[in-house]
Amino acid sequence: MKRTYQPSTTRRKRTHGFLVRMKTRGGRAVIAARRAKGRKRLAV
């Protein structure tokens, strides 16, 4: 059986990257929440 996590940098960036987050209102909310919390990494 193949494992579920098959890492791919391209796919990772395209689905969870900063620019993708900034596209939608919800994504911007995620970034804002992470900024407020003081996260070192805002997005992948």
Swiss-Prot record:
The gene is rpmH. GO terms for cellular component: ribonucleoprotein complex; ribosome. InterPro entries: Ribosomal_bL34, Ribosomal_bL34_CS. Gene3D superfamilies: 1.10.287.3980. It comes from Chromobacterium violaceum (strain ATCC 12472 / DSM 30191 / JCM 1249 / CCUG 213 / NBRC 12614 / NCIMB 9131 / NCTC 9757 / MK). Belongs to the bacterial ribosomal protein bL34 family. One of its GO terms (biological process) is translation. Pfam families: Ribosomal_L34 (PF00468). NCBIfam families: rpmH_bact. GO terms for molecular function: structural constituent of ribosome. Keywords: Ribonucleoprotein, Ribosomal protein. HAMAP family: Ribosomal_bL34. This is Large ribosomal subunit protein bL34.
